[in-house]
Amino acid sequence: MTYYLPPEKGEDLLGEASARRILEDAMVRDAELVAIPLSRLHADMLNLSTRQLGLFLQKLTTYGYRVAIVGDIEPFIDRSSSLRDFVYESNRGQHVWFVKDEAHLREKLG
């Protein structure tokens, strides 16, 4: 499976507008999965009450992309039980994953 991994450095990603830019980049590369560096997510994305993460992920998955958030999510889920539950449920599925690093992503892709 081909995936697009944006650079770790760059503007913070937040909401649907950022998702559209990522979609354009993924389409040009014929990717099937978008791997987003955790470091690129705006702080509000990990606060589920803002709904920004949901809007971002929904935009990508609506267009048929699988999504992986790549980075150490542990410090964030230690502070939020709702985020911990979201990550757990996401990782049980096939459309959105949270993985520690790119090697773990490649392992999940088999």
Predicted stretch roles:
Residues 2-110:
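Amphipathic, Lys/Arg-enriched alpha-helical "gate/interface" segment within cytosolic domains
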